[in-house]
Structures are given as C-alpha cells and as structure tokens.
C-alpha cells in the first residue's frame, strides 16, 4: 500500500485528489496538510513527509516548485497539480532531480481522461486530414471572486488556470506546433489578471485554436474538429468535475457518464450522433500506482507538462509583442 500525503485541501485537494485517491485500492491517504479540519490533518510539511511515500502537491501555484523539490530531496514520489510550475527553469530542475533520485514525478493533467476528449481522440482518424481544431472552455463569471488566482503574480490568471488543460490536450493530438499567435486580455471591469485568451497553434495546413472567456453566457462548442472527410462537434463540459463537487463517489457506475452526444457530419452532409466516451479521472492515480509499484510509465510525463509551460510563455510573448512567433523563437525561452 502506498501512503499518500496531500498538500492543500482547497478545490483541487478536496474535490479532485482526495476522492480519486480513496477509490484507488493501492493508495492510502495517510496525511493532509491543511488549515481545515480533517481526520488525517498534520501540523507541518515535515510531518507529512514522514508519513508519506507519495506526496501530492495541490497548493497554490507558486508553492508547487519548493514543495515538490523538498519532497523529491526526501526521496518521495511526487504528483504536482497543474500548472506544473510557474516557469521553465523550475520544471527543468524538478525533472532533473526526479531522475537523479529515481523517483516518480508526474503532473495532474486529468483532462486527458475527459470523456469528450477521449471521444474526439477516437474520432480524429475518421475525419481525414484535420485542418481546423477548436477547443473552448468558456464561463460566465462577470463578478471577480476573491482568491489567489485573481491577484497579480506568477501563476495567476486564466491562462495558467485553464490554458494548461487545453494546451496539453492539443499536444497529445498534434505534437508541438511550428508557430503560435496569441491574444491575452483582462476584459472584466476591475480585473487585475487576464480572464480571456485566444491561442492559435500553427502546423502546416492545420490550425489549432484554443480559447477561453470569462464573459461567455452562451458557451461555444467544447470541441469542433473539421477535416477533409467531415466534422465533429461536441457541446458541454465533461461532467466529472461537477460530479465530484456534488460528492459523487468516483466508483459509482454513473460517474463520468456524459449523456450529451457529439455530432459527426459526413462529406455528403449527413449527420450522425455519437455517444460520448465515459470519462475516467481515476485512471490517472491507477497509473501513478503502477509507475511506483511496477515501474510502468508515468500517466503524464513531466516533460509534456514542461512543453505546455513553454507554449504559455510563448503565448504571453506573442500577445505582448502583437505578433506570431515561430516555434524556434522558443530557444531563448527554454533556457
């Protein structure tokens, strides 16, 4: 049994990590570092390290690097919530440290196991040459909530919050782009950090458009894929987050089931509805356990997460300079 120490018990720790850890039969939640009441609460990070084999970092973004570094130095396996770190140098240091310590290091890119993404991934080869991929994550939050994500600083803003998910999904399907163009804005009155982004990743004839808005009362399609053999469009977010917020046990048969179907349009104009694959976030922690106990590949390679950070850096540069950046421009950022 792998003893797990959970650092942070806010939205990520309480809603996502704890329920998924509890239903994985090879993991045991042994310690939780939080100011909230919890039966596994410990008084310090040091106490948590003493009781843990695997440390899950679900604290605010700027804490990810120092906490993950300390855990790896103490020969603990580490899961880091997204974003992996707030800069590339930190990501490089953690990856190198994990290699030296021969410890498992992975990043919680749970959206790889969204049912709608799995459906889009499955249908992709049937669309011929895909020429346009659009992914949207829209919300309607005209009022600014209090919290560290809304305060200027490294790791704040919607590009650091939702951007890693959309970018990671795109990289899983298409790999690194040849160029990027980005628009990143703070649109809400009184907003201190960005709450809107529009990224275009360029690949030969393919364009990948990743967009998020906080002022979208009527959301755009979650996915829209258009190719030489037809299109696939799916509305609505994967239900697992809302199910977890509602307290549903991830082991329940209805967990991850999305009744909203996608629409496949053929070359002849005929349409066909497609059932959405069942989402399965618990697969991430099953993969973590297999990596620790059996030497299996980690469910998310931290180098993949680093690639996403690189694109976020390039997106900010592109937006600030008002121009598209060829991917070789990343060389100065990657150091």
Where are these regions (language model features)?
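Hydrophobic residues in well-ordered beta-strands that form the structural core
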Residues: 57, 80, 105-107, 134, ...
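Contiguous beta-strand/loop segments that form the cofactor/metal-binding neighborhood of enzyme cores
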Residues: 168-248, 282-296, 332-335
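N-terminal Rossmann-like dinucleotide-binding module
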Residues: 1-39
